Amino acid sequence: MKIERDIIRIFREWKETPQRKPILLQGARQIGKTWAMETFGREEFEYYAKFDFDRQVELKSVFQNSKSPERILKELALYCDVPLIPGKTLIIFDEIQECEEALNSLKYFCEDAPEYHIIAAGSLLGVAVKKRKMTVPVGKVRVMRMYPISFKEFLRASNPRTFEYIEEINAIEKLPEIILNTLKLEYRRYLVCGGMPDAVCAMLDNEGME
């Protein structure tokens, strides 16, 4: 089952921002960062290219050899099967905490190649930065934090009718008893999943097969 994540709406707004900076997406592992970036790339761009510094260790040399975005992109093109076109390709740097030079390169993409759409993601990035004494290009990136699935996102997927009802009412209106009971039930179910995407999808998919 597809869970609509609010972070993708924020990505869409960022895409249309004239003074756009690369996104640095932070968050724990297994909360859906990679899924969100790839979904955004598929839905909003002609192409998307993902470079994973954890799985593709050879990528590190590309950033160690040059700080020029033009040179970096020319070499990265050798590692993917889609063109890297400004405005048409979303460039994803995944697990960027594994390559300090790639993290630093975001500064140069901001200054010298702002026409490219770049999202970089890191797991436990704050820990890595402190432990390895890495530097984040402050002021040259838009830092975003992603969390596990919220109750709002869960309810939207699990019980669309109740979600739509809640969205349409006035905030000061008293909720009918049936809605309150439904919300309590859904919240208990949400707590069982813990907001982790795999657990939420497994629960909702299993219900669909019953």
Q: PLM features: residue spans?
A:
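Phosphate-binding site recognition
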Residues: M1-E210
